[in-house]
Amino acid sequence: MADALKDVPFKTVQVDALVAIKIATASGKAFPSLATGSLVGMEKNGVLEITNSFPYPEINTASADGQNDTAANLSAAAPRAKQNIAYGNEMIKFLREVNVDANNVGWYTSTSMGNFVNLNTIENQFYYQSQLNERTVALIYDVSRSSQGTLNLRAYRLSPSFVTAYKEGKFTTESLQKSSLRYQDILVELPVTVHNSHLLTSLLHQLPSEAPKEELSFPPNLAALQQDPNTPLPPLFPNYDALDLSIDPFLEKTCDLLLESIENHHTELNNYQYYQRQLAREQTKITAWQQKRKAENAARTASKQPLLPEDEWQRLFKLPAEPSRLETLLNSRQVEQYSRQVDGFAAGVTSKMFAVKSNLLPGE
């Protein structure tokens, strides 16, 4: 993690609680569609502080330029759409007029079950890092994971090596070997912290509870006061619902998505193997033609006739174009993302099973 962060202009991302609530609200309303928006804030002492956000307006599919674009594709590409860029610039102008942070520091998008490693995410973040502001970040909010009661908000940036390769637009086997680019080098994850102001923290501790309906006796001691059900609990009190022994339903769904990504990965590998077979057949034909032409030129030399050109094969034969390896890299990175989620789910389920093992298996 430290090696990946050494070339990043900032080391951590600090998100205001109000921004996290805005992102969660917009993502929940748009679910199962994607919700995207812009982030504003400032960088201070190696920390990217995100202090405000605003969602992008919904794109009408009837007024879109492309006839084949679906609503999902338009929503995913919203951060780099021309109308949304103009909308974001206008919003930042208004924010500057009211004297609040008005620096574009990135964008956010919602996802489900960690399914965000795709070409749209890469193109959006590349646009922000290369054209708007190099010091930008992408916040990924997982609606499905957050519905379990734990905020799932992650920050990512494109690595410098991947940005260089993406600018060149060459993702062939030779270019990947020269640059030593791996699927682990596509995205760099940054630690995220949620920040509350002191006033908000004080308010959380002073929130009144519901008034009792009958007169209560004065508690004789502190222990009785702590055991009183009418005593308000402190904020962020532990939630014991997480101790439920039922198998997490998201584990099964994540496994299905993992298998689907593996199938897509095998499809890309089969396409590349087909290209290699086609290339080998063409190279065999070219080699046979060159040997035949050399034999003809040897006979012409013996008979003192003019030689035939030996580079004519370039006009007669056409080598197949190598398919881009970018999709394979993205599929590999998505498989890794799902594997991490399965590992996290399995750890919680396994610990619960070991905790109740003595009650489930008699005699142990």
From Swiss-Prot:
InterPro entries on file: eIF3h (IPR027524), eIF3h_C (IPR045810), JAMM/MPN+_dom (IPR000555), JAMM_MPN+_peptidase_M67A (IPR050242), MPN (IPR037518)
GO MF annotation, one: translation initiation factor activity
One GO process term, biological-process aspect: translational initiation
Location relative to the cell: Cytoplasm
Keyword flag Protein biosynthesis: yes
Primary localization: cytoplasm
Gene3D superfamilies to which the protein is assigned, alphabetical: Cytidine Deaminase, domain 2 (3.40.140.10)
Function as written in the Swiss-Prot or TrEMBL entry: Component of the eukaryotic translation initiation factor 3 (eIF-3) complex, which is involved in protein synthesis of a specialized repertoire of mRNAs and, together with other initiation factors, stimulates binding of mRNA and methionyl-tRNAi to the 40S ribosome. The eIF-3 complex specifically targets and initiates translation of a subset of mRNAs involved in cell proliferation.
PANTHER family assigned to the protein according to its UniProt record, in alphabetical order: EUKARYOTIC TRANSLATION INITIATION FACTOR 3 -RELATED (PTHR10410)
Database matches in HAMAP family: eIF3h
Family: Belongs to the eIF-3 subunit H family.
Protein name according to UniProt: Eukaryotic translation initiation factor 3 subunit H
The species this protein was found in: Phaeosphaeria nodorum (strain SN15 / ATCC MYA-4574 / FGSC 10173) (Glume blotch fungus)
